[in-house]
Amino acid sequence: MRTVGFDFGTHQTKVCVENREGAELQYEFFKFKDAKGVEQYTLPSIIGIDKKGLIRYGFLSDEISNTSGLLQSIKSLVSKQSGFDGKIVRYFKQATFTSTNNGISKMDAIFYSIWYVSYILFDLEEKYGQDFAIQMGVPTDGERLNLQKQLVVRILLSAYRLVEEVFKNDKDAFLRTPAQQLKEKTVFIPYCEDRKEEYNILVFPEAYACLMPLIKQNKIASGMSLMIDIGGGTTDISFFTINIENTPQVYGLFSIDKGLNYLTDAMNANRKRISSNVESASEILKERRISFEKEIESVCLKLNNSLAQEFRKQSRLPISRLTDALKARPVIYTGGGSTFDIMRKPYLGFKDIIHISKKEWRSECVVDMNRISALGLCPILSTSYGLSISMTHDNIKCEPFRDIFKLFREIQDEEQEKRFQYGRAFGGFSYTDDWDAVK
């Protein structure tokens, strides 16, 4: 069975498919045809409702084209101020999964999300039949993880119902259905664990999914690391180490309801603009970038304080030893926002800046790798790639901070036991204890 990594984004959606033939693995990004019929690696997360109430998805304007004749990068899509005669709906993903007020009600956003996901499901089932399992990402922190995962499952189950039961895989009939009628046909299905297993749906925090290609390739050194995924609507952060099984051990998941939308004040932009893409760093407002960076710093400071607190509890060593250990730790950047140099900076001890590129991927297994790399799409496609790496379960949880020092604590306990046994052998006197006391 194929594994589909479904990265439902605020600005654009990316899909990667893992094909497994015996021991051979291949990863291929699903391509979407724009209004000119040119294949693109991303689909704009935009819905257009025309004067007749009919809905279009993704590429709304015939004016958006690939002038080079090649698959182009996100940034080269020219932002058109007009070109679609009707209502344009954007940022429904952000309104579905965050508390950001962007003018769309929660329930309306959920319905838009169901329809948009359905649109992509039609194409996936046309190409692969039903021989695939979806692994989808969600923006979340540790506290909201289960609720956010359930929301994703409900949206996917509702979309499957529309595609397979209501429209019987007839995409044209789906597109001919006016919005009001489509709303009447749509049911927001309650969460059901059995249905989740039936469809082999797995859901992962977006900040976790980004880690998988790097971990599989042994691209991150052991020790404490930070991943920052700057998206359109949110910025997701994971604090993790690599365990002896070469899998990430997550100690903190954080999601900030600020991404490129906030940085560019997109909510007050021209609503008729077709493209959601940020074309250059000049669109990022300085005062908003400073505010954004302060929120990241706040997360890092919280991490630092928690680490220091646990270190003092569990160790007799000076705090400077922890400070030294945190010097020049990796901070890994991914997501569309990370493509701008001004957005990649060190935070506290995390000073070794890594930007996702071809060298962090298992490039020999990725179809069109050279083209994707040349277009600078690796950080944009990274989450969908990570999501497509087949997993057996999605029981991801944050381990307690005290366990970061578990091995260190066990070594200290073992040393203490040795001292005790040595002292007993000499009638309760231990030269080791005496030396420690002198030190």
Q: Residue locations for each model-derived region?
A:
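Glycine-rich phosphate-binding loop plus the immediately following alpha-helix
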Residues: 39-52, 242-302, 375-378, 438
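Phosphate/oxyanion-binding active-site loops and adjacent basic polyanion-contact surfaces
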Residues: 66-70, 101-120, 144-152, 203-207, ...
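Helical "lid/coupling" subdomains associated with nucleotide-phosphate turnover
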Residues: 276-439
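A solvent-exposed, charged loop/short amphipathic helix patch at secondary-structure junctions
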Residues: 77-104, 267-291
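Early-domain small/polar-rich strand-loop-helix modules and first-structured segments
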Residues: 1-96
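Glycine-rich phosphate-binding loop of actin/hexokinase-like ATP-binding domains
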Residues: 4, 11, 15-18, 24-30, ...
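Nucleotide/phosphate-binding catalytic cleft detector across ATP-hydrolyzing
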Residues: 1-10, 16-26, 84-225, 388-402, ...
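Gly/Ser/Thr-rich loops at beta-strand to alpha-helix junctions
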Residues: 10-12, 139-146, 231-236, 337-341
